[in-house]
Amino acid sequence: MDRRKFLKGAAIGAGATALAAPAAIAQGGKQLTIVSTWPRDFPGLGTSAQRLAARIAELGDGAFNVEYFAAGERVGAFDSFDEVSSGNSQAYIGADYYWTGKHPGFAYFTSVPFGMSTPEWNAWIKFGGGQELWDELSGSYGLKALACGSTGTQAGGWFNKEMESPD
């Protein structure tokens, strides 16, 4: 798999931060408004969302006027799904387990305790039918989901008492 080609495609398709040059507007560039579930400059997740948006603008070579909004700047963090689903913005960057209230299946497209490792998850998405399931689920809300990174397998939990049974 060509990593650069994949990253370029994911960046152009998925979306996130910074304003494109005014020349993009003058050239008739398409507006791409991206909202995030994370605060601006939040280490790791927030800063990577900003970098992704900047890269989309750069790789689009004037085709996109990219406008990025961190959590709370355009909509609240947990309103980003509905913002994009309604058509008010074109993309969001977040973790799909935030949307389990809409459908519990969204958890499987992020990370769950004791779940798959990042390589296992990527293999399932690309080769094991995961993307097709994700397309079906996200498509029912008018969205197209794309993987834009991974924080890895989530921990099983932190408890103040020893667990001795499933109960």
Protein language model features and the residues they cover:
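Extracytoplasmic "Venus flytrap"
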Residues: 33-51, 71-76
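Short helix-initiation/N-cap motifs at beta->coil->alpha
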Residues: 68-82, 151
